[in-house]
Amino acid sequence: EHPSVRKSAEFLEQEGFDVTYLAPNKDGIVTVSEIEQALREDTRLVSVMTVNNETGARFPIEEIAALLKDKPTYFHTDAVQAFAQEALTVDGIDYLTASGHKIYAPKGIGFLYKSKDAPIHALIKGGGQELGFRAGTENVPYILGLEKAMQIVVEKRDELVQNYQEL
């Protein structure tokens, strides 16, 4: 996992939560069956990157989502590496995160998708921005920069992927 996710898991451990880490197999992924075997009755969150930032290995996100569908477990995927490469679906995903810098948006902006049934609490209390999910004034220029970068990626995705493959 990317340090942004791994360090969050380590923080949860320091707060007294049990965290299970799974090692990737020879193909660089964690399989659905390995995740299924690691699930416990009290597992509340599974977090798996969509595409590995170092190897490019793509994880079976759709199958993991199907596995967790009827379980009391939320599913998060870090999609930062996948967003420019493929159209993503959020079917069965409770939380999806991505950072804008991978698609040439301003550094320091990203986005979070949250399904309507997934809980979320403000990290910092304060103003009522974003329906109370965050405190502080939104960085409108960065938001617009991310929006434009996302539009360009969607419009030119096939061309970009072909260029990546040729490199």
Predicted regions and their residues:
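Pyridoxal 5′-phosphate
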Residues: 1-167
